[in-house]
């Protein structure tokens, strides 16, 4: 909602036994380290920005919650496995490829989630409709972007899976 979670607020939140962790959506991966240190082993930190999944996991996030995972779940599962296997060179290459896909998903006039829905229709045969207001649907002008994003995902799967 546009509000940054501060270490002092998280420290206060940790006093509530119902708080088991936090999703960090800020871009600095140092914030993940801070929240991991504050919460300790009893609390989980999720990485938010899909573009930094690798960096977030290396800084201590135990998992991620991301908006683009649905368009390419196999790629994020592979990236997570590469981290577990300590194959960081390949992990970095895959993260770069994922970032190129994210760049394409976010380059249309329509909302990214609308683009993802169209990509899922092309790549997976899933017709799940469009986005609802206030999100902007994909336009006919966006068709080349959608097709390029779908192709990038297929090519990246062929390369890394």
PLM features per residue range, with description:
Residues 61, 72-161:
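C-terminal alpha-helical cap/extension of soluble enzyme domains
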Residues 1-99, 109:
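Catalytic alpha/beta core domains of metabolic enzymes, predominantly
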């Amino acid at each position: 909602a546009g509000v940054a979670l501060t270490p002092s607020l998280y420290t206060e939140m940790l006093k509530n036994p119902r708080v088991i962790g936090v999703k960090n959506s800020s871009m600095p991966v140092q914030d993940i380290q801070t929240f991991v240190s504050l919460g300790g082993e009893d609390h989980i930190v999720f990485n938010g920005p899909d573009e930094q999944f690798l960096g977030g996991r290396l800084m201590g996030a135990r998992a991620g919650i991301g908006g683009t995972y649905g368009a390419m779940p196999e790629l994020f599962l592979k990236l997570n496995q590469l981290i577990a296997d300590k194959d960081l060179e390949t992990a970095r290459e895959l993260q770069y490829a994922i970032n190129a896909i994210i760049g394409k998903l976010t380059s249309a006039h329509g909302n990214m989630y609308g683009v993802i829905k169209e990509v899922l229709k092309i790549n997976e045969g899933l017709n799940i409709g469009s986005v609802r207001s206030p999100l902007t649907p994909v336009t006919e002008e966006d068709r080349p972007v959608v097709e390029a994003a779908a192709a990038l995902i297929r090519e990246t799967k062929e390369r890394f899976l």
